[in-house]
């Protein structure tokens, strides 16, 4: 594996040793990779079937048990120091606690990046996990990749969970941690996303496509027997970095999907079922889709067509057919634009540029599509040429955004990654 490097690990350990006064050899490091979703865009929150894999970039959290209940955190990317205790009861952001006070909101807390650490404690407390040890930790993300549509938030949440569990000698399964990270984002932060991100980060294996049913939580690691050609993952950044929780578009789309499900279930005599699209049979959708308002019809069409693309994509990956896999990715991108109606103009331009780049099998938005980056699968031998082409064309299309991107690197060439883990 090309990430993390020995140099990166050593730097993290030195920072924690300096903070804690402990020997560098005592420092443990959580490796929490970022994820991409080749197929399965925007359907995890509806119980759909999704695919994902991690990349060789992500979050590193060096830590030692604090020896008491204190949590002390610093970050390579963000200012300030986060300090609190694991025996403090954490409450969802904005909700009043028993004393009438409220948990600090992200806009008011000095070190807002610490909200995910508090959220991890909230999730573990909510799950009746007994936390007696805090951590002294140093957090470092891959430069320029936060808020880029690669689920850095889920990776951070997973990192804090694994560190706290390790420090407290808790045995927790990946499936349980998927639920705990969901509690951070849904319960603590109020974000209405699904479980794709944390599932990919916790379940992926190098070289495999993670295939997951978000209704049953069943998952499969699909190994490609022999790909036709080596591939790389291209990440092209738009320059839009607005945090997901401040954009009403995401939660609005979730509500629209639920409303579409409600109409279809009522029309088919199944109104007692939870209004999520996974509870609507495809035949029911075909029979009653004409009853949906135009906007709701588009959301439902994206869900059902994307589910089918995931199924076909699994078959293409398992047979080593990258060209077919790529075509499905591009079709997913088009449906995200036309049916799910997400993607600001810079992202749409990036998507179109990637489709014309040399060696690209397929491309689509990464993340929610309201900010961040686009991803592409590309022939390994043509990855450099593709990156150069995308950089040049995007600079012409969006010079203001392109000139302020990712430390001068608007396009990154990545490889597949592995699951989140603790290095002792």
From Swiss-Prot:
EC numbers for this chain: 2.7.1.44
Manner of cofactor binding, per the entry note: Magnesium. Can also use other divalent cations like manganese or calcium.
Temperature impact on function: Optimum temperature is 37 degrees Celsius.
Reaction catalysed by this enzyme: D-galacturonate + ATP = 1-phospho-alpha-D-galacturonate + ADP + H(+)
Catalytic machinery residues: 197
Keywords of this entry: Acetylation, ATP-binding, Calcium, Carbohydrate metabolism, Kinase, Magnesium, Manganese, Metal-binding, Nucleotide-binding, Transferase
Tissue note: Expressed in roots, stems, leaves, flowers and young siliques. Higher expression in the elongating middle stem region than in the lower or upper stem region.
Gene Ontology cellular-component terms listed: cytoplasm
Entry keyword annotation includes Cell inner membrane: no
Coiled coil: none
Record: residues binding ATP: 146-155
Function noted in UniProt: Sugar-1-kinase with a strict substrate specificity for the alpha-anomeric configuration of D-galacturonic acid (D-GalA) and ATP. Involved in the biosynthesis of UDP-galacturonic acid (UDP-GalA) from the salvaged GalA that is released during growth-dependent cell wall restructuring.
Record PANTHER family: GALACTURONOKINASE, MEVALONATE KINASE/GALACTOKINASE
Name this protein carries in UniProt: Galacturonokinase
Gene name tied to this protein: GALAK
